[in-house]
């Protein structure tokens, strides 16, 4: 099973679910370039497609032939791009099942928060430079449905800030524009996937919660949906047991 993290965090996102998932699957997680403990080159052209390339190269290096994939947030669209390549016969391995957690699968149903808008704009580098642990906590708590422990947020902040990670955030967040430009390709990737697709969504997420769930039901009526009441943008932190139950994995 591949576990694809979101923005602006890292594969540490999966820590609460790791013990249960590892009892059922051989797990593979990595920090994509610009995230977590991976390199954060300033001159790199960050994109969702480049992140999909990284995952494709990794899977090939591990000799994996068939995989299930769970993704969140930014990772959702990395998975959409991998599915698009699979539909085109260009993916050198087989995705058998895909599970999506809260993320902007459909740009028209996604509502970025203020910090995302500021990072995306012309003052993004200044905003990133002035960011702090306190502001990070405020942003993360604004999109959560359940309380987030300060120690956990501290770990995530340390991984984000590692190797001057704040400096590349304005570059990476251009993925929001990339989603808009590739909306048709990545929506079609889901509609033409021909494999089981499942969306697990926390309904208290102001970015990609109920609106994404409603859009999923309209565009993908034959695919499954689980709504976790009271959870926000990070159901894998806030309600790991609910996510595992939705995935039919014993917690």
Please tell me what each predicted stretch does.
Residues 228-244:
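Catalytic histidine-centered segment of alpha/beta-hydrolase-like enzymes
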Residues 106-109, 130-191:
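Conserved alpha/beta-hydrolase catalytic His-Asp/Glu region
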Residues 1-37:
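Conserved HGGG/HGGXW glycine-rich cap/lid loop of the alpha/beta-hydrolase fold
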Residues 193, 199-201:
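Short beta-strand/loop motif that positions the catalytic acidic residue
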Residues 152, 186-187, 195, 209-218:
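Short alpha-helix in the alpha/beta-hydrolase fold that links the catalytic acid
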Residues 204-208:
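Acidic catalytic loop of the alpha/beta-hydrolase fold
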Residues 28-71, 84, 91, 245:
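Active-site loop/oxyanion-hole signature of alpha/beta-hydrolase fold enzymes
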Residues 65-110:
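Conserved hydrolase catalytic core segment
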């Amino acid at each position: 099973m591949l576990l694809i993290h979101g923005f602006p965090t890292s594969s540490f996102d999966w820590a609460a679910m790791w013990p249960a998932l590892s009892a059922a699957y051989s797990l593979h997680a990595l920090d994509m370039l610009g995230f977590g403990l991976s390199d954060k080159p300033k001159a790199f052209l960050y994109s969702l497609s480049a992140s999909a390339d990284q995952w494709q190269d990794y899977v090939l290096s591990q000799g994996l032939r068939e995989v299930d994939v769970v993704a969140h947030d930014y990772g959702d669209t990395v998975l959409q791009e991998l599915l698009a390549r699979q539909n085109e016969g260009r993916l050198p391995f087989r995705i058998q099942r895909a599970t999506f957690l809260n993320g902007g699968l459909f740009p028209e149903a996604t509502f970025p928060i203020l910090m995302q808008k500021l990072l995306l704009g012309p003052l993004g580098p200044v905003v990133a430079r002035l960011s702090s642990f306190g502001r990070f906590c405020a942003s993360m708590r604004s999109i959560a449905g359940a309380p987030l422990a300060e120690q956990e947020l501290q770990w995530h902040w340390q991984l984000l800030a590692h190797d001057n990670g704040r400096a590349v955030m304005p570059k990476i967040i251009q993925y929001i524009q990339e989603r808009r430009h590739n909306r048709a390709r990545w929506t079609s990737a889901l509609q033409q996937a021909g494999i089981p697709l499942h969306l697990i969504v926390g309904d208290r997420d102001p970015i990609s919660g109920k609106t994404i769930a409603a859009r999923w039901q309209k565009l993908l009526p034959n695919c499954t949906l689980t709504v976790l009441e009271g959870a926000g943008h990070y159901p894998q932190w806030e309600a790991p047991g609910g996510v595992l139950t939705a995935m039919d994995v014993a917690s």
